[in-house]
A protein has these predicted regions:
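Active-site anion-handling motifs in enzyme catalytic cores
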Residues: 1-373
Length: 373
């Protein structure tokens, strides 16, 4: 870090997402000075909030791992507001702020939150750098945030290329057992030695479905169709995050093994990277699978990310299927999966080589911490 003594990192996923309206009982609101005072008052009664108190740290810079937190939805995402408050606070303390590896996007399921954007403008303009992970976010930043030091680097997860492609191979479940599988004998029987296909959910399932049952029914139909059309392959569901919890019901209904949410991330990455095809509306799992050359069939998501990653990977056709596919769309997904599998190693090599390029590019992002505005 050169002259910097210490750097604070904010990690997203700490804060509950979803439809959130500010409450009089909560510390966060659109007035960040008031929010900071409220936070400090809340700490005695809620000690877990103490980590957010920047006064306790001896630091020179705050580095924000932006990822997918900054989707400008109405009502606002809570994690977006809290991370913005921390950036505001750090700048007020005279500290440097680096916003890295971020996405800036509209929410396809609500009105664009201009109030949040206006609140962020002075914060972003004071930051040392605003670095986004794909071209869609770069253009969005150009349109909405003036006077910022804007940079573009691929998602940091591409830097895992060497780890995903080392010599260790996962052939069965005993090497990747998470807590949920600790007493599950069937988990030991997971067979990754023969060709297999992976399926996960999408970040848009909650917004697109009327209820949990609708999502379960649609994905059960999809999974059964895939199993029927690809009898020569093992089929695995992948519970990527809490939003994919409904896949546990799909697993029971369709009698399909599921790779649980608590499975070690590197193990899941290797499993996805060696799948013949990955059907998903998830961004980071798609990157993990691509690192091994696995072609992805994308369903829509809660932002532009499932389109932007296809452009980043230089897909010949940019295509998103409905997050809750009907019978015709399921048939299209099956057709696309078969086409991609039949392209074999030529397609896999093309994807993998592109990921190697992106991994070499994203590693350069660390140099931003040594640069001056």
């Amino acid at each position: 870090m050169g002259a910097y003594k210490k750097v604070l990192y904010t990690v997203n996923r700490f804060f509950r997402r979803g439809h959130y309206y500010f409450s009089s009982a909560d510390f966060i609101n659109y007035d960040f000075d008031k929010s900071i005072k409220n936070l400090i008052k809340c700490i005695p009664a809620n000690p877990h909030l103490k980590d957010f108190d920047l006064r306790q740290y001896d630091f020179d810079a705050l580095v924000v791992n932006g990822e997918g937190s900054f989707i400008f939805a109405t009502p606002p995402w809570r994690e977006c507001m809290i991370e913005a408050m921390l950036m505001y606070w750090a700048e007020k303390m005279g500290k440097k702020v680096y916003f890295l590896n971020g996405m800036l996007s509209k929410d396809p399921y609500s009105d664009e939150n201009r109030k949040t954007i206006e609140l962020l403008k002075p914060i972003f303009s004071k930051a040392e750098v605003i670095s986004v992970r794909e071209q869609y976010s770069y253009k969005y930043a150009q349109q909405n945030f003036e006077n910022i030091n804007l940079k573009h680097y691929p998602d940091a997860l591409f830097s895992w290329y060497k780890m995903i492609n080392d010599d260790f191979r996962i052939t069965n479940g005993k090497y990747v057992m998470g807590i949920q599988g600790a007493t599950d004998e069937e988990f030991y029987e997971f067979d990754f030695s023969k060709p297999y296909i992976c399926i996960s959910g999408s970040s848009a399932v909650g917004n697109a479905s009327k209820n949990k049952k609708e999502a379960i029914d649609k994905y059960s139909e999809l999974v059964n169709k895939v199993k029927n059309e690809f009898k020569e392959y093992n089929i695995f569901l992948v519970e990527v995050c809490e939003g994919d919890a409904f896949l546990n019901d799909v697993s029971k209904i369709t009698n399909t093994p599921i790779i649980a949410i608590d499975t070690p991330i590197l193990a899941v990455g290797k499993i996805l990277a060696n799948s013949r095809v990955f059907i998903s509306g998830r961004y980071h799992p798609a990157i993990l699978s691509s690192l091994g050359g696995t072609p992805c069939i994308f369903m829509s998501s809660n932002s532009h990310k499932t389109r932007s990653v296809q452009e980043l990977l230089k897909y010949d056709e940019i295509k998103e299927y409905n997050v809750l596919p009907n019978a015709d769309e399921i048939n299209e997904i099956i057709k696309k999966a078969r086409e991609d599998i039949e392209k074999g190693e030529d397609l896999r090599k093309k994807i993998k080589e592109r990921c190697l390029e992106l991994s070499e590019e994203t590693i350069k992002q660390k140099e931003l911490l040594r640069s001056e505005k």
